[in-house]
From Swiss-Prot:
Lineage, top ranks: Eukaryota, Metazoa, Chordata, Craniata, Vertebrata
Location of Phosphoserine modifications: S245
Residue span of region 6 X 2 AA tandem repeats of [DE]-R: 150-161
Residue span of region 3 X 2 AA tandem repeats of [DE]-R: 139-144
One GO CC annotation: ciliary basal body
Assembly and oligomerization: Interacts with POU3F2/Brn-2, ATXN1, TXNL4A, HTT and AR. Interaction with ATXN1 correlates positively with the length of the polyglutamine tract. Interacts with RNA polymerase II large subunit in a phosphorylation-dependent manner. Forms a ternary complex with ATXN1 mutant and phosphorylated RNA polymerase II. Interacts (via C-terminus) with TXNL4A and CD2BP2. Interacts (via WW domain) with ATN1 and SF3B1, and may interact with additional splice factors. Interacts (via WW domain) with WBP11; Leading to reduce interaction between PQBP1 and TXNL4A. Interacts with CAPRIN1. Interacts with DDX1.
Region: 5 X 7 AA approximate tandem repeats of D-R-[NS]-H-E-K-S, residue numbers: 104-138
PANTHER family in the record: POLYGLUTAMINE BINDING PROTEIN 1/MARVEL MEMBRANE-ASSOCIATING DOMAIN CONTAINING 3, POLYGLUTAMINE-BINDING PROTEIN 1
Top-rank lineage group of the source organism: Eukaryota
Primary residence: nucleus
UniProt-recorded name of the protein: Polyglutamine-binding protein 1
Start and stop residues of the Sequence repeats: 104-110, 111-117, 118-124, 125-131, 132-138, 139-140, 141-142, 143-144, 150-151, 152-153, 154-155, 156-157, 158-159, 160-161
GO MF annotation list: double-stranded DNA binding; ribonucleoprotein complex binding
Organism name: Mus musculus
Length: 263
């Protein structure tokens, strides 16, 4: 790989490098940076009419003639008898593209109009649906009102029946109370409840959970074996002692069997 020229010169000055390579010659290429394709020299030489110019077409490499005022072109010179003026291909393409865009826009506009008309047709349908929903809502509200009225009527009937029952009970109590006030004395002494009688303070039922006894409670029973034990005591902690004698038990059993046979 060759050394750069500046480095070779520096090394040659120091005496390190004695042979200098010749500097390569740079190739110079002339280019035309003018984008104007109009050939003014050919236009002047051919003596073209005013506003006509000879132009070079870079796409095909052929010249054509261009009128700058009308923006029309021709492949032949205006002095040629077969001279025909037309629009440029680029302009024709642009016009066609514009026409296509315009037609597309028109089609889109037509489609939008159709969609708008469809929506306008759908709008009455929605209005009908809304009216149907309103009718259904009114029907439901009417049914709820009817149900509410029926419930109120049922409550009124129940209230009236309760009032009638209370009035009947009150009248019945009033008649019973009046009958008791009019009676000079109770009809039957047995009708008086035993609960109305005063309890004997010595009765176990007055100070304990023992049941209230009768006039025969605690008296010796017939054909009962005399054990000498307290028969009123009950519960798991009480045991009847002393035990009766075997003879007393046999006599009691015999007496009970005779009584059963007589019955």
């Amino acid at each position: 790989m060759p050394l750069p020229v500046a480095l070779q010169t520096r090394l040659a000055k120091r005496g390190i490098l004695k042979h200098l390579e010749p500097e390569p010659e740079e190739e110079i290429i002339a280019e035309d940076y003018d984008d104007d394709p109009v050939d003014y020299e050919a236009t002047r030489i051919e003596g073209l009419p005013p506003s006509w110019y000879k132009v070079f077409d870079p796409s095909c490499g052929l010249p054509y003639y261009w009128n700058v005022e009308t923006d029309l072109v021709s492949w032949l010179s205006p002095h040629d008898p077969n001279f025909v003026v037309t629009k440029s291909a680029k302009k024709v393409r642009n016009n066609n593209a514009d026409a296509e865009d315009k037609s597309d826009r028109n089609l889109e506009k037509v489609d939008r109009n159709h969609e708008k008309s469809d929506r306008s047709h759908e709008k009455p349908d929605r209005s009908h649906e809304k009216a149907d929903r309103n009718h259904e809502k009114n029907d439901r509200e009417r049914e709820r009102n009817y149900d509410k009225v029926d419930r109120e009527r049922d409550r009124d009937r129940e209230r009236e029946r309760a009032f009638d029952k209370a009035d009947r009970e009150e009248g019945k109590d009033r008649r019973h109370h009046r009958r008791e006030e009019l009676a000079p004395y109770p009809k039957n002494k047995k009708a008086t409840s035993r609960k109305d009688e005063e309890l004997d303070p010595m009765d176990p039922s007055s100070y304990s959970d023992a049941p209230r006894g009768t006039w025969s409670t605690g008296l010796p029973k017939r054909n009962e074996a005399k054990t000498g034990a307290d028969t009123t005591a009950a519960g798991p902690l009480f045991q009847q002692r002393p035990y009766p004698s075997p003879g007393a038990v046999l006599r009691a059993n015999a007496e009970a069997s005779r009584t059963k046979q007589q019955d």
